[in-house]
Amino acid sequence: MKADLHIHSVFSDGSDSRESILQKAAAVGIKVLAFTEHDTTEGWQESIALGRRYGITVLPGVEISACNAETGKKVHILGYGFKSADAINALCRPVAEARHENSLQKIKVLQKLGYKITEADVLPYAHKYIFKKHIVRYLFESGQEDKIFGHVYHKIFHGGGPGDFGIKYVNAASAVKVITESGGKAVLAHPGQQNNFEILPELKKAGLWGIELKHPVHNAYWQKFVLQAAADYGLFCTGGSDCHGIYSEKYHAVGSNLCPAAAAEELLK
């Protein structure tokens, strides 16, 4: 059973519609899929019905932007199979709104630097909240950047540039708890990306169910660490493509990383 449990659509910072993603998933034999949008569960019930049209079981999903309260290190928490999304959205909404305001400040920085850009220019690229990827896509398509992930993205929005400022994320343990209390399963996403394995004892205590094994950033080196952590803490191993469409420097197609069967089967129970 082929399952891709980490996908982003236009509902957050992916470039493709959910129907387009489901079409691509069906074409490569995906049978189970989860839309794991950043800090929103919007449209999760409609997506389940849409998936049936393509012979795909769509699991309720989310990716919560969190952090280690002690170190401040970023921690992403995936949630699957929740029965209600109210508490999850209540936790995530301030983060989503803060990200949008952060993006508006980034636009102001660009204006001061001489770029021709307004909020109205970028809004058509966003579903509800503006992400920095929407900003740089507009700059690319308006001829002000030679590629989406160019100078603005790397030198202005990152690396200590004038538009490099972040937002306050939720406590990672709180994210795990709210997913669990909503009837779902909480998973530590791509720990190799942030190298945040040290938070596992706290997350396990909060109810962590799984850890992401198959992911574009997880080469053999990181998979070894993940497998050991899964054994040490009694966690299921999950996986997915983390597809963002054109909003990835290296394109990750739907189905390019699959969830191990044991976790997928457990989530379907």
Where are these regions (language model features)?
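Divalent metal-binding pocket/active-site signature
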Residues: S15, H100-L104, K108, L113-N196
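Non-transmembrane, interaction-prone segments in cytosolic or luminal domains
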Residues: Y115, D121, H127-Y138, K214, ...
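Mid-domain alpha/beta scaffold segments of enzyme catalytic cores
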Residues: S20, K31, H38-Q105, V109-A126, ...
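An N-terminally biased module of ancient metal coordination in phosphate/nucleic-acid-related enzymes
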Residues: M1-K74, I156-H158, D164, N171-G183, ...
